[in-house]
Amino acid sequence: MKAAVLQEKRSLEIKEIPDPGSPGPNYLRVKIISVGICGSDVHYYTDGRIGDFDVENPMILGHEACGSVEEIGKGVHGFQVGDLVALEPGVPCNSCQYCFTGMYNLCKKMRFWATPPIDGALTEYVLHPASFTYKLPDDLDPSVGPLIEPLSVAVHAARKTGVETGDVVFVNGSGTVGCLVSVVSKMAGAHKVISSDNNDNRLELARSMGVDKAINIESENLQSEVFKYTDGMGVNIAFECSGNN
């Protein structure tokens, strides 16, 4: 099968790699339909690293994936061949204290797609644990399926901060995660959502997704615009989603 392999910094090749075969117990074989390109994928491509994670060997990129179930392993229930699914990219060890207490996102042995040395999903087929695979509506456009992963980030953020009816929310950064945080905040009941960025195209996208006030921080004074829009009250919840240094 084919995969998009990052050979080294700024060198991405479509290569033939071994097919993963049939799924074992509790696993699914999934045919990948669409994969989102995250900022981390871009950094690995342009810089060959993110923080302490260096691409020392060829690696398949992509961790935001949507596909269809092609084969079902023993012990798996609730799935049928052909189901449209989203795939959670981080698979924990399921045997440490973090995993036992439901905080598996902190697992020290987490295997996260497209994080060196773990391969990602820009390939034709993957084998994935059924417990980290989620059914999507059959009529959903598969091209938006990968957005489930960043959407989960936004949902977690809104839940953790307790966004509720009447809140005035500020979101710094109008990229993918920032826009999704804005949408989720509105759905959670926020009265007003204010978004900022230095890119007019992103701000226009934020407006189209329901942001009440979009501020360009390079041409407008952020503080004065926020207080003006909120009649001097300011905001009671703020999210940092700019993702810059």
Regions found by a protein language model. Give the residues of each.
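NAD(P)H dinucleotide-binding glycine-rich loop of Rossmann-like/cofactor-binding domains
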Residues: 93-172
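Mid-domain Rossmann-like dinucleotide-binding core that forms the NAD(H)/NADP(H) cofactor-binding site
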Residues: 140-220, 224, 237
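Conserved amphipathic alpha-helix within the SDR
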Residues: 222-232
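Short SAM/SAH-binding signature in class I
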Residues: 233-239
